[in-house]
Design a protein with these regions (language model features):
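Alpha-helical "hinge/linker" immediately C-terminal to small N-terminal DNA-binding modules
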Residues: 1-28
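Short, well-ordered beta-strand segments
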Residues: 38-40, 85, 134, 182, ...
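C-terminal effector-binding regulatory domain of bacterial HTH transcription factors
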Residues: 10, 186-195, 205-249
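Acidic, Gly/Pro-rich loop/turn segments at junctions of secondary structure
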Residues: 69-165
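Alpha-helical segments flanking ligand/cofactor-binding loops in enzyme cores
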Residues: 100, 126, 172-173, 227
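Central regulatory/effector-binding core of bacterial HTH transcription factors
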Residues: 35-94, 246-249
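Alpha-helix/helix-capping structural signal
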Residues: 43-44, 113-114, 169, 187-188
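Hydrophobic hinge/microswitch elements
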Residues: 156-200, 207
């Protein structure tokens, strides 16, 4: 479909959803989530936060069918016909979406104890140039590491290393195999750091805050199934995000 065609198709889908909701209301079922709910999440975030609670959500709403997809790219809700997306970004300015911030995360530097014992622990940001740095890559991430300190200093550093990957999970595995230092999101490393498999490096520095948002196609009407998901996210996912982030503060 062209962009115009995709927009038209989404508008038609919204009209049909409104008609279905009106019919359900007339039959006293407006508040009962049912039908198909299409959810999109960034893959690594979804693995940590969505997967553990998805079965319970489906059991709570047995008349719902959840179509759950993952993506590393900026979601195009209009083209994909997605009802609601979970998305991570430092800034969000796309007027096509209705956004609600549900939490904040950040990324931190970490390495394995064995790597640090062999190559030494960096004492300053300049020392990172002497180390093997493993980097995430996707369209929303720059080739540099942008770091901020507790006293609001900002630092940007070009890094080099033996590995560039598009998923935090792969980098996490490689860091645990003593390959180098990586800048990884809190949710990806929290268990490894808690158990001692990884250690935080240059703990006074981290990435800028990254907002976690629920995104919906920009519209005034939100049907019962989408409302149920938004409520579930706020009750179960938001507190977990907050707890994980506060662990590192």
């Amino acid at each position: 479909l062209t962009d115009i065609g995709a927009t038209y198709a989404e508008q038609c889908r919204q009209v049909l959803a409104m008609v279905e909701e009106a019919e359900a209301q007339a039959m006293g079922m407006a508040t009962k989530p049912q039908g198909k709910l299409r959810v999109l999440s960034m893959a690594s975030f979804g693995h940590h936060y969505v997967s553990p609670m998805l079965a319970e959500f489906c059991q709570t709403y047995p008349e719902l069918t959840v179509e759950y997809r993952t993506s590393q790219n900026v979601p195009d809700l209009l083209a994909k016909g997605i009802d609601v997306s979970l998305y991570l970004t430092e800034s969000l300015a796309d007027s096509r979406f209705m956004a609600r911030r549900i939490g904040t995360i950040f990324s931190l530097l970490c390495a394995s104890p064995a790597y640090l014992e062999k190559y030494g622990e960096p004492k300053s940001l300049d020392d990172l140039q002497k180390h093997a740095c493993l980097r995430l890559v996707n369209p929303s991430i720059t080739p540099q590491w942008h770091l901020v300190s507790e006293n609001s200093c900002s630092y940007q550093i070009d890094i080099t290393g033996p590995l560039i990957a598009d998923t935090p999970e792969l980098l996490l595995d490689m860091v645990q195999q003593d390959m180098g230092i990586a800048l990884l999101p809190t949710f990806a490393v929290i268990e490894a750091i808690r158990t001692g498999r990884l250690r935080r490096v240059l703990a006074d520095w981290r990435s800028p805050d990254i907002g976690v948002y629920t995104l919906l196609p920009s519209r005034h009407f939100i049907d019962a199934k989408t409302r149920a998901w938004l409520t579930w996210v706020e009750q179960y996912i938001s507190p977990k995000i907050q707890s994980d982030t506060e662990y590192f503060l």
